[in-house]
Amino acid sequence: MTKIGLIDYGMGNLFSVQQAFKRFNQPLDIISDIKTLQSCDALILPGVGAFDPAMMNLRKTELVPSIIDWVNNGKPLFGICLGLQLLFEASDEGTSEGLGVIKGHIRRLPQEKDERIPHIGWSPIYKTNECPILENYPGSNWMYFVHSYSACPLEPKHTVAVTKFGKTDVSSMVWHKNTGACQFHPEKSGVAGQKIIFNWINWLKKNKF
């Protein structure tokens, strides 16, 4: 069985993510140091909260160089919510440098008529590019969001799904090398979110990571 590590840096809802993967009989090992990280085949980077405190906490674990090497070497990583944002170079929300494994910036959601910030609730996502975790996926599906910022990848091909925020398309999923991430919470998005998780687990098994 693929050994998947769930990174614990004090800013992720670990229990709900573990429960979501448990539905597919996939255990997750809690990762908080380099030794346990190196024993894994794949990683999950969750996240709830603000960009700067998250990067500060992540640096305290001394895992940052290892995570950067992990992604750059093509090993699989799955980011969730704030975990997606940390993959980028920087954020409008703070002054800290992100992991920088995907080129681009995290921008505050635009002011749109009839839309509130933070964006909390259900919105459909629309596939814009192919990636393994969107294989055989319908044209759109509703996911659960809680965020005030969204990713703006330098290369548009890294956005694989968007959601409408007023009249603006904002990135809701990214893919680069073997790293994928969701701005929404797949673990809280019912059957549609479970499909994302299933596809990722299945992709790991097919590729024998």
From Swiss-Prot:
**EC numbers on record:** 4.3.2.10, 3.5.1.2
Residues at the active site: 81 (nucleophile), 185, 187
**Reaction it catalyzes:** 5-[(5-phospho-1-deoxy-D-ribulos-1-ylimino)methylamino]-1-(5-phospho-beta-D-ribosyl)imidazole-4-carboxamide + L-glutamine = D-erythro-1-(imidazol-4-yl)glycerol 3-phosphate + 5-amino-1-(5-phospho-beta-D-ribosyl)imidazole-4-carboxamide + L-glutamate + H(+); L-glutamine + H2O = L-glutamate + NH4(+)
Q: Name one GO biological process term.
A: L-histidine biosynthetic process
Keyword list (alphabetical) reads: Amino-acid biosynthesis, Cytoplasm, Glutamine amidotransferase, Histidine biosynthesis, Hydrolase, Lyase
Query: Where does the UniProt entry say this protein principally localizes?
Result: cytoplasm
* Molecular function via GO: glutaminase activity; imidazoleglycerol-phosphate synthase activity; lyase activity
Instruction: Tell me the SUPFAM superfamilies matching this sequence.
Output: Class I glutamine amidotransferase-like
Subunit composition and interactions: Heterodimer of HisH and HisF.
Query: What's the protein called, per UniProt?
Result: Imidazole glycerol phosphate synthase subunit HisH
Q: Lineage of this protein's species?
A: Bacteria, Bacillati, Cyanobacteriota, Cyanophyceae, Synechococcales
Q: Which gene encodes it?
A: hisH
